[in-house]
């Protein structure tokens, strides 16, 4: 495990239940999360798989749902072959999604830990804000 983490937050003018739906419904996920195809049955212990294309190359990221508290919070592990690291437990990140009512609608936080390097953190620090902006555009559009 590493101590490298990142966290990003955004306010969205939509109710928490609507945000939760966009975070956990595959056809909506693809609209805000860079066109990925997502598979999961959203149960603790179940797999979560994201398939897509990055820089012209297909990829498959995978993990497991480890915590689920509808419609407030879910946590899943995450490993990507694009990391270049072996598919081993110590190479999985933990991704936390928190959905909280706010005066403007909903505050959404995504946090990631056990990032393998500062370079990986830099990629996350570019990707998560864009994904959250895409989520807001989908829900407020």
Where are these regions (language model features)?
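Hydrophobic ligand-binding cavity/cleft-lining segments
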Residues: 1-39
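Intrinsic-disorder/low-complexity, polar/charged segments enriched in Ser/Thr/Lys/Arg/Asp/Glu/Gln
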Residues: 3-9, 16, 47, 60, ...
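Hydrophobic/basic alpha-helical segments enriched in Actinobacteria
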Residues: 8-9, 36-38, 69, 100-104, ...
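Hydrophobic pocket/interface hotspot
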Residues: 19-20, 29, 48-50, 65, ...
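Hydrophobic-ligand binding "helix-grip"
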Residues: 31, 38-43, 57-103, 113
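Surface loops and adjacent helix of pleckstrin homology
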Residues: 34, 53, 79, 111, ...
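Short aromatic-glycine motifs in intrinsically disordered, low-complexity regions
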Residues: 46-56
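A conserved amphipathic terminal alpha-helix motif
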Residues: 113-141
């Amino acid at each position: 495990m590493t101590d490298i983490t990142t966290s990003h937050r955004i306010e969205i003018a939509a109710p928490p239940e609507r945000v939760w739906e966009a975070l956990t419904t595959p056809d909506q996920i693809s609209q805000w999360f860079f066109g990925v195809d997502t598979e999961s049955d959203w149960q603790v212990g179940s797999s979560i798989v994201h398939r897509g294309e990055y820089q012209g190359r297909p990829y498959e990221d995978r993990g497991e749902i480890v915590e689920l508290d509808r419609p407030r919070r879910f946590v899943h592990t995450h490993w990507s072959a694009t990391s270049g690291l072996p598919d081993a437990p110590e190479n999985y990140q933990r991704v936390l999604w928190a959905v909280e009512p706010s005066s403007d609608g909903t505050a959404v936080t995504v946090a990631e830990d056990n990032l393998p390097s500062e370079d990986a953190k830099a990629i996350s620090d570019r990707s998560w804000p864009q994904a959250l902006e895409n989520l807001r555009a989908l829900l407020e559009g």
